């Protein structure tokens, strides 16, 4: 005797061997090919203009600029914006580290009852 879970009665019910070994919802796939559906062609507009957004290749210039031996660290070569970004990153890193250490200290202290 084979049993299969009945989703209607929410209990085990008797079943044939072929039904019991086939998981619910999974049946053999049919071998018939689905009908071919062709998409309707879209109408292209005739006023298409091409723009070149890539611009000039700046890589060789930037390589020369960053490889220049002027004693300035690489992360500060571009001046004030790089300095501000560096200082902001360091301040946020230090602030986050201090915050985590304070949170760990507070979590390690027992509460008074």
Curated annotation (Swiss-Prot):
Q: What induces it?
A: Specifically induced in muscle upon exercise. Expression is induced by ATF4 downstream of the EIF2AK3/PERK-mediated unfolded protein response, thereby increasing formation of respiratory chain supercomplexes.
Query: What gene is this protein a product of?
Result: Cox7a2l
User: What is the similarity comment for this entry?
Assistant: Belongs to the cytochrome c oxidase VIIa family.
Q: How does it assemble?
A: Interacts with the mitochondrial respiratory complexes III (CIII) and IV (CIV), promoting their association.
Q: Name the pathway it acts in.
A: Energy metabolism; oxidative phosphorylation
Q: Where is the transit peptide?
A: 1-54
| Listed SUPFAM superfamilies | Mitochondrial cytochrome c oxidase subunit VIIa (SSF81419)
General function of this protein: Assembly factor that mediates the formation of some mitochondrial respiratory supercomplexes (respirasomes), thereby promoting oxidative phosphorylation and energy metabolism. Acts as a molecular adapter that associates with both mitochondrial respiratory complexes III (CIII) and IV (CIV), promoting their association. Mediates the formation of various mitochondrial respiratory supercomplexes, such as MCIII(2)IV(2), composed of two CIII and two CIV, and the CS-respirasome (MCI(1)III(2)IV(2)), composed of one CI, two CIII and two CIV.
Q: What is its main location?
A: mitochondrion
Q: Which residues carry this modification: N6-acetyllysine?
A: 68
Membrane topology term reads: Single-pass membrane protein
Provide the protein's localization. Answer: Mitochondrion inner membrane
| GO molecular function, a single term | protein-macromolecule adaptor activity
Entry GO terms, CC: mitochondrial inner membrane; mitochondrion; respiratory chain complex; respiratory chain complex IV
Species lineage: Eukaryota, Metazoa, Chordata, Craniata, Vertebrata
The UniProt disruption phenotype note reads:
Knockout homozygous mice manifest decreased mitochondrial respiratory activities and impaired formation of mitochondrial supercomplexes in muscles. Mice display muscle weakness and exhibit heat production failure in the cold.
Write the protein's name.
Cytochrome c oxidase subunit 7A2-like, mitochondrial
Q: Name one Pfam family in it.
A: COX7a
Give the record's GO biological process terms: mitochondrial electron transport, cytochrome c to oxygen; mitochondrial respirasome assembly; regulation of oxidative phosphorylation
List the InterPro entries hit by this protein, alphabetically. Answer: COX7a, Cyt_c_oxidase_su7a-rel_mt, Cyt_c_oxidase_su7a_sf, Cytc_oxidase_su7a_met
Q: Which UniProt keywords apply?
A: Acetylation, Membrane, Mitochondrion, Mitochondrion inner membrane, Transit peptide, Transmembrane, Transmembrane helix
Transmembrane annotation, as ranges: 81-106
